[in-house]
Amino acid sequence: MAETLCRMFQESVKKFADYPAMLRKVDGSFRPITYREMGDRVRGLTTALLSIGVTRGDRVALMSENRPEWAISDFAILHAGAVNVGIFPTLPVAHVEYIISDSGARCLIVSDQEQLAKALAVREKFGDLCIISMNAPRDGAESVLSYEALLRDGEASPLADHKYEECWSSVRPEDWASIIYTSGTTAEPRGAILSHQNFVSNYSTARKVLTFQQGDTLLSFVPLNHVFGRMVDHYLPISLGSTIAYVENLRRLRQNIQEVRPHYMAVVPRLLEMFEEGLKAAFTKEPRVRQKLIAWAFSSGRAMVEVQAGGSVGPLLTRKRWLADRLVFRRLRDRLGLDRLRFFFAGGAPVSRDTLEFFSAMGLPIMEGYGLSETSPLVSVNPPGRIRLGTVGRPFEGVEVKLADDGEILVRGPNVMQGYYKRAEETKEAIEPDGWLHTGDIGTIEDGYLSITDRKKNLIVLANGKKVLPQHLETLLLGSPFIFQAVLVGDRQNTVGALIVPAFDRVREWARAHGVEGHVGDETGFIEEPAVRRLIRMEIQRLTEGLADYEKIRAFALVDREFTLEAGELTPTLKIKRRVVLERYGHLIDSLYSDSSESN
C-alpha cells in the first residue's frame, strides 16, 4: 500500500497510464485526460511551484470550482511537499481573508475572474500573497501568475524530472497534506490538520467496502474543497483508476448526468431531495393511467425495500418488483441517465426516510455514510447489499466508535486529524490523551450500525428541562411535499417552535386546486393566507403525530423566501447555518412566543 498521496498518485499514473483519469466539457462534449497526461501536468505544475519559491510545509490555498485544474493543483501542491488549504469559491471576501490570514498561506490558486477579484481584494491586506489564475488574468491584474504559463514552463524545465522526483519521494506519511476549514454552521471555521497518512488510511479502508473499480465513471459534484468530496470524488477514484467527470455547474447537473451516465455519484441530501421533488412534480403531469402505474410501481418497490430490510423476499413480491422495473423504473433510469448507476453515496447530513425509500424503490440505492473534516472524513458506511435505512452504517476497518455517557459519538483511528491549526487548547478539548475524538454528534448504535440523531450544540433544552433533538424533527418535516426547509427553535422556552420555508411551487399548485387565488404571485402575502397556514399546520401535525408531547411543534412562522447559499444561510454542502438563521429571523422567533395565535 502506498504510504503517501504522492506515491499513490505515481502508482496510479504508471498502472493506468492510458486510461482516462478525468473528463471535462470542451466544445459541447466531454473529452478525456489520461492518467499519463494528468501525471505530466502534475509534474509540470509541481516544478513551477518549486521555481516560484514554494517549499516543504508552505500553505498553498486553492479556491476553485470542481474542474481538472483543481485535481492537478492539489496533487502538485502535495508533490511539492506543501499543504493544500481549500477555500470554497462561494465564500465572500471576508471569509477568504480570514482563512488566508489564519492559515498563513503564501500562495493562492484561483479559477476564474470572480475568484481572482476576491484574491486581489485579499492581497490588499496581504501584499506578499502570490496569486495564480487558472483562467487568463484580466487586464490590469498586475503580478498575477498564469496557471497555463507556469504549467508550460514547468513541463519544459530541464530540471523538471530530477527536482520533481526528489521532492515528492521525500514526502513522509506524517507530513501535513491539507488544512480543512470547517463549514461553520454554529461557529467560526477551524482548520483541521490532515496528514498524508490520515487520507491514505481512509481511502485504503473505504475501497474494501465500497464497490468502486477501475473503469467506473463518476460525476464530481460535491465541492472538492469539502473533505467528503475530496475523498470520494478525488483520492478514492484516482487510487482505483476510475474516471472523474466534472459537472459544469448546478444548472447543468441533470444534463451532465445524462451525458456521463455515471456508475456512482457522491451527493448531499439536498440534491437527492431536489431530484425527488422534480420527479414527483413530473409524475403529476402524466396521463391518469400512467400515474396509477407509477404509483403501483413505487408501492411494489417500497414493499420490496421494507421486506429486504427485515428478511427474505417471497416469489410474488419478487415478480411484482421485476414487473415494476420493466414497466416503469428501467425506462425512468434510462431517461435520467442513471441506467448504469449502482448507488448514490450520501454524506454531510441525514437523508429522510421517505427519500431513501423513494430512490431504493427505483433500484437506485443510497449508501449513507458518516464522517467529519476531523476524520479525513469517513467513519462508517452502509455496506452494499446490507444497507439499513436510517443508519449511517458500520464503522470502517481499523476505526473504533463508541458512545459517551451523554450519547456523544467518539471516534478513534488512523483517520483522526492531527489537531486544529494554531488551536492547541481546542485540540486538547476535542481529542482525549488516548486518541478518542469528540465528534460533537449525538447518536445510537444497534447491531453494529450507527445512527446520528443530532449535533450536540443544536440540542434544544426547554424551560422544563426536557431535551429536544431538532435535526430529527426537521428531517420529519421535510417528508412533506409542501415544506422546503425547516429550522426548529425553542431553547429555554416552554414549547417547540419552527421556522418553515414552504415549497412555494407545490403549495401554489395545491392552492389553485382548492380555489385559493389570493396573493398567489406574492410570497409575502401568500404565506399569510389562512388556507396556506392551515395546510402547513396539518402537515406538521401529521408528520409529528407519534412524537412525545413535549417534542410537538406548537407554533410556527412561515418565511417568505428560501434560505440560500448566496445569502450566507447555507454551507457549501447546502446545510442550513443554524446560527445565521436564528440571528437573521430573531423577530419571527420572538413572535412565536409573544403571540402564538399570530404564528399559528
Q: Can you annotate each of these PLM segments?
A:
Residues 17-20, 155-181, 188, 211-217:
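Conserved pre-ATP/AMP-binding loop-to-beta segment of ANL
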Residues 21-75, 92-97, 146-152, 196-197:
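Conserved AMP-binding/adenylate-forming core of the ANL superfamily
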Residues 27, 114-173, 279-331:
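ANL superfamily adenylate-forming
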Residues 32-36, 168, 177-203:
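Conserved AMP-binding A3 loop
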Residues 39-44, 173, 192-213, 330:
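Conserved structural elements of the adenylate-forming
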Residues 51-52, 79-152, 535:
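Structural core segment of the AMP-binding/adenylate-forming
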Residues 200-217, 224-329, 340:
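Conserved AMP-binding/adenylation subdomain of ANL enzymes
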Residues 395-462:
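Conserved ATP-binding/catalytic segment of the ANL
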